[in-house]
Each structure stands twice: as structure tokens, then as C-alpha cells.
């Protein structure tokens, strides 16, 4: 039962209705006997700064961060974990230090690793936002044959591909318009979708 001593954590994004995080986290808190509550907050981009500052003032302990805030939220934090700084995106905030972290990449790599190896695979990444940045950097560390980053805004795809190359993790990364995805997928071993299309489908159901 929520009371005055309950610690609040949550998710910020726009939208958040699709998220499975609240039931998953709250079930875990209950099972572990932890006095925490996980709450989703639908925050429009123009309200991001006030939401972050307000959350700290309200003694909220931490946030997970989802689309579309993973990059822009960094400017409102005091510290960044080295990996989050390298990636250029944040998906977790600890308000105790106003510090941002990124766990998207390692989470994706571990999930794929349960099914297949990434080494020597031809990989297509759809999207070039915060999640795509994290995943692309981690993929590059696993020695894939190639990484193709496809995005609606081709300049964002180009920028991400160049950042991955500049990290010296791999040279086998390129970019293109997401309009050409059919041609890339036909030759791909692994397809990773980081675009909002999946969320739109979930909201429709």
C-alpha cells in the first residue's frame, strides 16, 4: 500500500501508454517486499526540463527514459556515466546525483545473445535515436560483419554511423534511408527496430 514513506520511481516518455514497465516493476517490488511504486509519466518534449526539475524537487528517486527524451534529457543532468556520454543518450536517471546512465545497449546484446551470436552477422538497425545509438555502439563491440543504420532522417543516420566509426570500435557501419529497408532486410541476419512504429501498433491494441 502506498503511503508517506513509499519511494517513487517511474518512466518518462511520450507516449507511455504502451509500456510494460509499470506492471513488471511493481510486481517485482511486491515480490521483494520493497516499499516502492513505479509510475509512468507522459511528458511532452516542451515540458521535459520542468518535469526533470520537478521530479527532483518531489524527491522521486529515479526515472527510466524512453522515446523521445533519451538525448535531450542529458542537458538537464549534472553527471553522465562514461558509457552514456560515449553513446550520447540516457535511459536511466538517478536523482540522488542527477546522473544519467544507459543500459539499452547491454540489454539488447544480452537478449540477442540468448538466441544467436552477433559476431560475423549482417545487422540492420532501424532508427537513429537514443536507443539506436546505445545499441549500435554495443553491437560494434561484438565484431559483426556489418551494421546498416536506416532512418527516416538520413542525416541522423549518417551522424550516428560516423560517431560509431569515430569510436574506433568498427569500420563496418554504414547508413541509408529507411525507405530502402526491404532491400537491406533481405540480406540481414538480425533486424533491430528502434522506431516508434512498434509502439503505434501496441497503442492500437
Feature names for model-found ranges:
Residues 2-116:
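Phosphate/diphosphate ligand-binding glycine-rich loop within oxidoreductases
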Residues 13, 121-140:
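Glycine-rich adenosine-cofactor-binding loop
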Residues 68, 195-196:
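Short glycine-/small-residue-rich Rossmann-like dinucleotide-binding loops
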Residues 141-146:
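Conserved S-adenosyl-L-methionine
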Residues 147-164:
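NAD(P)-binding Rossmann-fold cofactor-contacting core
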Residues 188:
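An anion/phosphate-binding loop that grips the pyrophosphate of nucleotide cofactors and donors
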Residues 200-205:
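Conserved small/polar residues in nucleotide/adenosyl-binding loops
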Amino acid at each position: 500500500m502506498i503511503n508517506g514513506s513509499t519511494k517513487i520511481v517511474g518512466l518518462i516518455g511520450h507516449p507511455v501508454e504502451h509500456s510494460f514497465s509499470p506492471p513488471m516493476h511493481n510486481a517485482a517490488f511486491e515480490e521483494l517486499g520493497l516499499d516502492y511504486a513505479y509510475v509512468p509519466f507522459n511528458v511532452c518534449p516542451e515540458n521535459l526540463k520542468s518535469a526533470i526539475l520537478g521530479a527532483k524537487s518531489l524527491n522521486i528517486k529515479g526515472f527510466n527514459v524512453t522515446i523521445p527524451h533519451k538525448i535531450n534529457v542529458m542537458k538537464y543532468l549534472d553527471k553522465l556515466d562514461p558509457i552514456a556520454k560515449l553513446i550520447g543518450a540516457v535511459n536511466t536517471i538517478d536523482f540522488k546525483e542527477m546522473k544519467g546512465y544507459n543500459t539499452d545497449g547491454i540489454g539488447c546484446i544480452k537478449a540477442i545473445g540468448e538466441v544467436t551470436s552477433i559476431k560475423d552477422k549482417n545487422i540492420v538497425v532501424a532508427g537513429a535515436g537514443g536507443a539506436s545509438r546505445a545499441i549500435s555502439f554495443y553491437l560494434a563491440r561484438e565484431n559483426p560483419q556489418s551494421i546498416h543504420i536506416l532512418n527516416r532522417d538520413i542525416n541522423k543516420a549518417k551522424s550516428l554511423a560516423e560517431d560509431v566509426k569515430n569510436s574506433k570500435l568498427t569500420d563496418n557501419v554504414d547508413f541509408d534511408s529507411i525507405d530502402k529497408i526491404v532491400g537491406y532486410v533481405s540480406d540481414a541476419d538480425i533486424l533491430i527496430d528502434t522506431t516508434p512504429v512498434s509502439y503505434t501498433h501496441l497503442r492500437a491494441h
